[in-house]
Amino acid sequence: MDLCRSSILLLIIALLSPRTLSMRYELKSSKTKCIGEEIHENAMSIGKYFIVNPNEDNHPLPDSHKIIVKVMPPQGKNLHEADKVEAGQFSFTAYENGSYVACITAIDYKPETTLTIDFDWKTGVHSKEWTNVAKKSQVDMMEYQVKTLMDTVISIHEEMYYLREREEEMQELNRSTNSKMAWLSFGSLVVCLSVAGLQFWHLKTFFEKKKLI
């Protein structure tokens, strides 16, 4: 019982902590960097990206600073595609459990150039910008907090349901593996006994021919 409570507590802490992929990295011309995120079914996900301007005086980005972006589900058509852009954003609701991947490619350019990419990806309850909603609709702080808590509770429920499904899948896999191992052990035993019987028969035949028995 204590273990169950501890697991639920850890799950709540994990969901209340920021589930955000936020990074800044360098990417050379024609190179690709892919980032994956494990997302469960019906979870909301949003992301944004842009090339950091190397010009201190905020001049327009040079022609070499363009990227190609693709966001791919576990299977099926791409959820987002952008060709030769400087910045962009995407949003989707996951239609199946699995690993969703975002790939960013710097365009091929000579001479080779190094781009600095700023990438931000939020999933689940953290993808819903309640702060912006509160500002736009001018709701009071109490209503804002209630909405945030309700959204967190829903997210916890969905996460627990997802974990229960994964546990059932693992149990089914274990049962299937144990069954296969049992049949494999039985087959190995039959083969060993058959080989032992053939060896015994061969030795008996050999000794009879030699008239040793």
Curated annotation (Swiss-Prot):
According to the UniProt entry, where does the motif COPI vesicle coat-binding sit in this chain?
Answer: 206-213
Report which superkingdom the organism of origin falls in.
Answer: Eukaryota
Mapped to this chain, the residue ranges on the Lumenal side of the membrane are: 23-180
What would be one Gene Ontology cellular-component term for the protein? Golgi cisterna membrane
The UniProt annotation puts motif COPII vesicle coat-binding at 206-207
Where in the chain are disulfide-linked cysteines found? Answer: none
Write the protein's name: Transmembrane emp24 domain-containing protein p24delta8
Q: Which GO terms describe its biological process?
A: protein transport; vesicle-mediated transport
Omega-N-methylated arginine modification sites are: R166
Signal peptide (residue range): 1-22
Location(s) in or outside the cell: Endoplasmic reticulum membrane; Golgi apparatus, cis-Golgi network membrane; Golgi apparatus, Golgi stack membrane
Which keywords does this chain's UniProt record carry? Coiled coil, Endoplasmic reticulum, ER-Golgi transport, Glycoprotein, Golgi apparatus, Membrane, Methylation, Protein transport, Signal, Transmembrane, Transmembrane helix, Transport
Coiled-coil ranges per the record?
A: 163-176
